[in-house]
């Protein structure tokens, strides 16, 4: 795992098209912004895991995450 230190307003690049920007830090919470092309899915881990579980169970959710 790559570990980076960023300050509020600083950005990191993932490949050529995805950026992750630190928007704010408040206590133990960090707000980040992600810019990615439409064809790149971006989800919180718990949402991604739910999507994967639904795929495995053959169900489709409403898509409202």
Swiss-Prot record:
Annotated Gene Ontology cellular component terms: cytosol
UniProt xrefs under Gene3D superfamilies: Translational regulator CsrA
UniProt cross-references to SUPFAM superfamilies, sorted A to Z: CsrA-like (SSF117130)
Family from the record: Belongs to the CsrA/RsmA family.
Organism lineage: Bacteria, Pseudomonadati, Pseudomonadota, Gammaproteobacteria, Vibrionales
InterPro entries: CsrA (IPR003751), CsrA_sf (IPR036107)
Main location: cytoplasm
UniProt GO MF annotations: mRNA 5'-UTR binding
SUBUNIT field: Homodimer; the beta-strands of each monomer intercalate to form a hydrophobic core, while the alpha-helices form wings that extend away from the core.
Pfam families membership: CsrA (PF02599)
Swiss-Prot/TrEMBL GO biological process terms: mRNA catabolic process; negative regulation of translational initiation; positive regulation of translational initiation; regulation of carbohydrate metabolic process
Keywords: Activator, Cytoplasm, Repressor, RNA-binding, Translation regulation
Keyword hit for RNA-binding: yes
Name of the protein this chain belongs to: Translational regulator CsrA
Domain of life, per lineage: Bacteria
Cell inner membrane recorded as keyword: no
Protein location: Cytoplasm
Role of this protein: A key translational regulator that binds mRNA to regulate translation initiation and/or mRNA stability. Mediates global changes in gene expression, shifting from rapid growth to stress survival by linking envelope stress, the stringent response and the catabolite repression systems. Usually binds in the 5'-UTR; binding at or near the Shine-Dalgarno sequence prevents ribosome-binding, repressing translation, binding elsewhere in the 5'-UTR can activate translation and/or stabilize the mRNA. Its function is antagonized by small RNA(s).
């Amino acid at each position: 795992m790559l570990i980076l230190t960023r300050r509020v307003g600083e950005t990191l690049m993932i490949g050529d098209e995805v950026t992750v920007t630190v928007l704010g830090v408040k206590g133990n919470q960090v707000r980040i912004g992600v810019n990615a092309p439409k064809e790149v899915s971006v989800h919180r881990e718990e949402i991604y895991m739910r999507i994967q579980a639904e795929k495995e169970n053959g169900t489709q959710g409403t898509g409202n995450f």
